[in-house]
Amino acid sequence: MDSEKVGVNYPEQFHRISRTDRRRKKKLDRAVLFFDIDGTVLSEITKEVPVSAINAMKAAQQAGHLLFINTGRTICSIPPEIRRLKFDGYLCGCGTYLTYQDEVLFSSSIEKKRGKEILKKATECNLGVFAEGQEDIYYPERMSRFDGLESSRRYFHRRGMGMEQSIEKGDFIYDKIFLYEDERSDLKS
């Protein structure tokens, strides 16, 4: 609507801001889209990436949008079927690792000595624990009473991970831990 047709005279400054805002809007037409892996990109039923999802993601990239995986998993545990999709970047390990176009922009790991202390304390408190790093996943040597931990161990063992080194050895650097607790756990220590 033309301002003069309705009897309103906006100052020239308003028109300049409007043009600037239009330019900003054009820049904002490009979005960054974040996708989780489990149950989002990778079907929990078929354990595959649906063709419809692949087509939608390709269309989004062709439209100029950036696609990122945003997952609690660490970078080493991203399945090959996800990596083949050519995402623009990965935000992994609950925010501990960020890449964009194959360049690491941020990485935060727990220092080795401190990591050993944390795992030792978790074990002393009778918690189920496994550690996730950029290189591998680390499980206890012995089977755990926690079904979730053992289910995770089986899943990653099938993918060739979590078998090289146990948390008891502790000669590794990791980014995060996953804890399990129950009535036998000591949460007060």
Identify the residue ranges that each predicted region occupies.
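Non-catalytic pre-domain segments flanking phosphatase-related domains
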Residues: 1-35
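A general structural motif
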Residues: 28-30, 64, 126, 172-174
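Asp-based phosphoryl-transfer active-site loop
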Residues: 31-46
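Small/polar loops that bind or transfer phosphate-bearing groups
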Residues: 45, 69-70, 179
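A short acidic/small-residue loop/turn micro-motif
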Residues: 49-51
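Active-site phosphate-binding/coordination module
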Residues: 54-148
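Conserved acidic, metal-coordinating active-site core of Asp-based
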Residues: 121, 127, 132-189
